[in-house]
Amino acid sequence: MSNQNNQNNQILKNTNAQILDEFNASIMFDKELYAQDIKGSIAHSKMLASQGILTNEEQKAIEKGLFQVKSEIESGEFKFSLAYEDIHMAVETRLTEIIGEPGKKLHTARSRNDQVCTDFTLYVQDKTLSIKEQLKELVATFVDIASLHTTTLIPGMTHLQHAQPLNFGFHLLAYANMFKRDYERFESSFERNNYSPLGSAALAGTPHNINRELTAQTLGFTAPTLNAMDTVSNRDFALEILFNISTTMMHISRISEELILWSSYEFQFVRMSDQYATTSSIMPQKKNPDVPELLRGKTGRVYGNLISLLTVMKGLPLAYNKDTQEDKEGVFDSVKTVEISISILNEVIKTMIVNVDKMQNACKIGHLTATDLADYLVQKQNMPFRTAYYITKDVVALANSLNKDISELSIDEIRKANDELKNINEDIVLYLDLKNSMNARNSFGGTSTKQTESQIEYFKKWLENK
């Protein structure tokens, strides 16, 4: 009985050890950082050699060995295992197997605390640059399509109700502005976070005679970070990229929502390529906007990753805590999500077919030029705006009774709507014309064709300089 108990206890102990290893290890996800880990280690070894801590021969052996490790990982020859715990130990262990004793010297004047911060910062900076380029391409696509539709009318909406006539190019440029701001957020984050953690060690620096400026320069950073304790505790750079991605995905979700509406039977403003829509499994007549719906849906998981890391960080005492091992998976997931989302949205916009007639006919519903009538009465008749507002309501009521849009009323019909309009000038009809209304909004940033073309020229210059 005693032997049986001992066997059971040993099985339980082994099982618990395996569970603990799986719980504690990060290797199965932080292996994503292998390239940054090796890049940081090469820079660190060069600095150690320049300071006389390593010999030149040792440094060369380390660098050559690290390139071999990188090659083995990329070819699939290297097999990741929980035994390594994390990417740092995996690389160092394999390096030491390849080159022997010099591999054991690589970690001199370094802690995994500053090492992981360096790896993760390099990853975030790399992805910041690549996402920026994707956003630039997306802005260019919106500008290209907008340039084709500076005179195409579309109902401008507030509260999802018809409000005023716009041109479709102007509407698309609203999204170009959103994604331009996203680009600029990534751009400013890159500059703010471009400082090297390497050499901060565990939390207080190192007694070794190191040169942090050299490693910062080698790795492409602006300078070393200023405070070792803050450095190993800091995950602001990860939070920033998560916020930037969340904002970008929010903008992607908004255009996706409009694409879903515009492609519906009720709107029919655009037709998406068959590549980005699917048919129903039971209703053969349907064409479902699956891709925009997925883009809209994926926004939630990205928001979740941001909230998750904010929650991890909110109560951590200085300096390093194991909690921050939970910082990476959400970032990796959000990066991959936004990369594929931008790429797919770009193609959806490029390939959509715009139904110009449907858009322009929709402008004849909802009295989009009612505000123009009120503005006319203020400007031409010197009426107080509130008086003009109520007179315009009478004209709208008349149009409804005649089953017409206000833009379709004749001068005689307008004059019958209210006693104040009995002698109104005939040019009022021109103010109610949809295209004239759109072009009348010629203030800076407005929807007129002239202003829209000016905005397009602005974006073309912006794109040339990026």
UniProtKB/Swiss-Prot annotation:
Query: What is the superkingdom listed in this entry's lineage?
Result: Bacteria
Which protein is depicted? Answer: Argininosuccinate lyase
What sort of enzyme, by top EC class, is this?
lyase
Q: Which InterPro entries match?
A: Arg_succ_lyase_C (IPR029419), Argininosuccinate_lyase (IPR009049), Fumarase/histidase_N (IPR024083), Fumarate_lyase_fam (IPR000362), Fumarate_lyase_N (IPR022761), L-Aspartase-like (IPR008948)
UniProt keywords (A-Z) are: Amino-acid biosynthesis, Arginine biosynthesis, Cytoplasm, Lyase
Q: What PANTHER family would the database entry show?
A: ARGININOSUCCINATE LYASE
Stored Pfam families: ASL_C2 (PF14698), Lyase_1 (PF00206)
Pathway membership: Amino-acid biosynthesis; L-arginine biosynthesis; L-arginine from L-ornithine and carbamoyl phosphate: step 3/3
